[in-house]
């Protein structure tokens, strides 16, 4: 049954747009139903954020800090409930969504540290005064959230934006509306002033209306490259608006020399199939050196991947992974596999739908070595490819043969190999003997090329949430001892 699912100026409201719903990805049972925000709802949310901005920006930082800390405490208190909500909507296992909520809590501490270090106040003494650097909020920021981490990734935009003094209009993915609703209720419970965060639910039309609003001063986005490019075009010619895009990747894992085969296979499994392959840093390409060592690695990879436990989020014992986000997404993944096979790829492990109409998919591994015209696409699911190479220079060239530039990784005991990769890699994240999906919130997160700009959702998020204000200051004014040539007071 539809319910008030928009949060505007501190109140829950019924949307005026079309009704939409969310179902369980595994069994298609209804989970959530409400009306989307139409253009007038979006306008009201942006107006509320604009009206709330002056007072929020002038609120002492210590008060903004305390409110964000209260939100973190509420996340801790409601961790199990929020994790279960995320699991039901995404089908990710409970063990994984509990870590997501914990990451949301940790992001508060990281954001507080980042605000002080990267966007606080600094002063440099000069002979006749001081040079002072301060930072000021942009104003109203639109935040677009993804479905794969519907709590953690929007949180990585919203928390630093609020700390900097911005107000927010949040548009979550239409595939995870309930997680967004539960999260906003915690912000409300934390005592957030009316209008500081507003939420509009809906799909493409809602998003386009928000991006087109003249009341926003910037847009922070995490999601697919296709949507990111669309938003970039929509905001073209508006340099006054900050635009931060974190998009996808066609990431390569280079398996060069193997000391422990099972350790290398575990790293590859974590890189390719964690979250059912629905992380932007997942390895879509595994590059394996030709030879018996590489053959043994691939054989073991297929063996272990074929035995992965897949199931419902609340199953016991817990599965390694659940399904993809929807039955439609599962269909797209199966179509992608079919296309790779039609091009000449060889199925080493065929991805299969485990239940009719369900989003549960088994992992797929396709050898595309020597196959021409393989699409440079991010297949967002449990499907990876194998490409064999002859030498390390060739591996690096293959890794860089993508319009994306998010992550690349190396399995090798040789530091020299990693140093080589660091020099040649075109990627924002370069890992050595660590899963591609591993990242530190204390480090930048993001890439180059079609993977986006700026570094959302991590320590460097503070950079795009405030603009620098430079001042030359002196408490008194005196005539210089030495005047400029041609200037006289005689």
From Swiss-Prot:
Give, as in the UniProt entry, the pathway in which the protein acts.
Amino-acid degradation; L-arginine degradation via AST pathway; L-glutamate and succinate from L-arginine: step 4/5
> Quick check: keyword Oxidoreductase in the entry?
yes
Q: Which SUPFAM superfamilies match?
A: ALDH-like
Q: Molecular function (GO) terms listed? A: succinylglutamate-semialdehyde dehydrogenase activity
Q: Report the catalytic activity.
A: N-succinyl-L-glutamate 5-semialdehyde + NAD(+) + H2O = N-succinyl-L-glutamate + NADH + 2 H(+)
Positions with a binding annotation for NAD(+): 223-228
Report the leader peptide range. none
Question: Which sites are catalytic?
Answer: 246, 280
One GO BP = arginine catabolic process to glutamate
Keywords, ordered alphabetically: Arginine metabolism, NAD, Oxidoreductase
Alphabetical list of PROSITE patterns matching this protein? ALDEHYDE_DEHYDR_CYS, ALDEHYDE_DEHYDR_GLU
**EC identifiers of the protein:** 1.2.1.71
What CDD domains is this protein classified in? ALDH_SGSD_AstD
Gene3D superfamilies, per database record? Aldehyde Dehydrogenase, Chain A, domain 1, Aldehyde Dehydrogenase, Chain A, domain 2
Record function comment: Catalyzes the NAD-dependent reduction of succinylglutamate semialdehyde into succinylglutamate.
Q: Which family does it belong to?
A: Belongs to the aldehyde dehydrogenase family. AstD subfamily.
What HAMAP family does the record tag this protein with? Aldedh_AstD (MF_01174)
Name-wise, this protein is N-succinylglutamate 5-semialdehyde dehydrogenase
Q: Which gene encodes it?
A: astD
């Amino acid at each position: 049954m539809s319910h008030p699912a928009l949060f505007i100026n501190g109140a829950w409201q019924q949307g005026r747009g079309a009704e939409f719903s969310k179902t369980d990805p595994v069994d298609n049972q209804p989970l959530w139903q409400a009306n989307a925000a139409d253009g007038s709802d979006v306008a009201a949310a942006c107006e509320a954020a604009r009206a709330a901005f002056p007072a929020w920006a002038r609120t002492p930082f210590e008060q903004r800090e305390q409110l964000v800390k209260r939100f973190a405490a509420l996340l801790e208190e409601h961790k199990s409930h929020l994790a279960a909500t995320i699991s039901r909507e995404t089908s990710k296992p409970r063990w994984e969504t509990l870590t997501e909520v914990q990451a949301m809590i940790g992001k508060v501490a990281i954001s507080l540290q980042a605000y002080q270090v990267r966007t606080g106040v600094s002063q440099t003494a000069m002979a006749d005064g001081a040079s002072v650097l301060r930072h000021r909020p942009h104003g109203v920021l639109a935040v677009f959230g993804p479905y794969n981490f519907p709590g953690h990734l929007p949180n990585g935009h919203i928390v630093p934006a609020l700390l900097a003094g911005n107000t927010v209009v949040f548009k979550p993915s239409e595939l995870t509306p309930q997680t967004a609703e539960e999260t906003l209720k915690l912000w409300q419970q934390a005592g957030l002033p009316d209008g500081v965060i507003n939420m509009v639910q809906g799909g493409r039309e809602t998003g386009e209306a928000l991006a087109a609003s003249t009341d926003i001063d910037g847009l922070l986005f995490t999601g697919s490259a296709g949507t990111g490019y669309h938003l970039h075009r929509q905001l073209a010619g508006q340099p006054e608006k900050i635009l931060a895009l974190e998009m996808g990747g066609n990431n390569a894992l280079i398996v060069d020399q193997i000391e422990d085969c099972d350790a290398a296979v575990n790293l590859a499994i974590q890189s390719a199939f964690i979250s059912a392959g629905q992380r932007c840093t997942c390895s879509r390409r595994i590059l394996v050196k030709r030879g018996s060592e590489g053959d043994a690695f691939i054989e073991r990879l297929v063996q272990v991947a074929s035995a992965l436990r897949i199931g419902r989020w609340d199953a016991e014992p817990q599965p390694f992974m659940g399904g993809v986000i929807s039955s439609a997404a599962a269909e797209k993944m199966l179509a992608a596999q079919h296309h790779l096979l039609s091009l000449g790829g060889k199925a080493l492990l065929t991805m299969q739908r485990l239940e009719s109409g369900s989003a549960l998919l088994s992992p797929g591994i396709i050898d595309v070595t020597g196959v021409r015209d393989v699409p440079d696409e991010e297949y967002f699911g449990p499907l990876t490819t194998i490409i064999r190479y002859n030498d390390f220079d060739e591996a690096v060239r293959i890794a860089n043969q993508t319009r994306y530039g998010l992550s690349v990784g190396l399995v090798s005991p040789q530091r020299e190999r990693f140093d080589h990769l660091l020099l040649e890699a075109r990627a924002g994240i370069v890992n050595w003997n660590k899963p591609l999906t591993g990242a530190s919130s204390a480090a930048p997160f993001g890439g180059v090329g079609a993977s986006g700009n700026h570094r959302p959702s991590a320590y460097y998020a503070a950079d795009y949430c405030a603009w620098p204000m430079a001042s030359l200051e002196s408490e008194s004014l005196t005539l210089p001892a030495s005047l400029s040539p041609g200037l006289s007071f005689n």
